Each structure stands twice: as C-alpha cells, then as structure tokens.
C-alpha cells in the first residue's frame, strides 16, 4: 500500500511533514509518525501555540489517498 498526497501527487512516507489549513484558514504542520491501517494515520500536529499534539486521523482529513500496488 502506498499513500499519495492529493495536492502534489507525491508519495507520503512516515517522517514526512505536511502543512494543511483548517476551516478557519490557520495553517498547521503535521508530521506523519505511523500508518495504522484501514485509512488511519498517527500524526504529530504543531498547533498555533507552538505545542505538539499527537492524534490519530483519517487519511482523507489530511487530503491523502491509499493506493494499492
């Protein structure tokens, strides 16, 4: 299984950093830590207050797609 970024079309692997905007337009940095399977990913999110938050998120919320090879 490969995970592809919808915005750039490039493959995303554990350790990569993504920058995404939330619904209010604020930018957040997400570092991919691990793929949990079944469309979920474990991430480290840098918030506006310069704090790191660890989350499990669906791939779709980070604009990522799973591709089977």
Positions of PLM-derived features:
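Mixed-charge, Lys/Arg-rich low-complexity intrinsically disordered regions
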Residues: 1-14
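Short aromatic-glycine-enriched beta-strand elements
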Residues: 39-42
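Short beta-strand-centered aromatic/proline hotspots
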Residues: 26-35
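Intrinsically disordered, low-complexity, charged/polar segments
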Residues: 45-69
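Generic beta-strand structural signal
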Residues: 13, 35-37
């Amino acid at each position: 299984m490969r995970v592809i970024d919808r915005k750039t079309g490039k493959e995303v692997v554990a350790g990569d950093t993504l920058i995404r905007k939330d619904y209010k337009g604020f930018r957040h940095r997400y570092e991919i830590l691990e793929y949990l399977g079944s469309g979920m990913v474990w991430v480290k999110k840098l918030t506006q207050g310069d704090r790191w938050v660890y989350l499990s998120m669906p791939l779709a919320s980070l604009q990522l797609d799973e591709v089977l090879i």
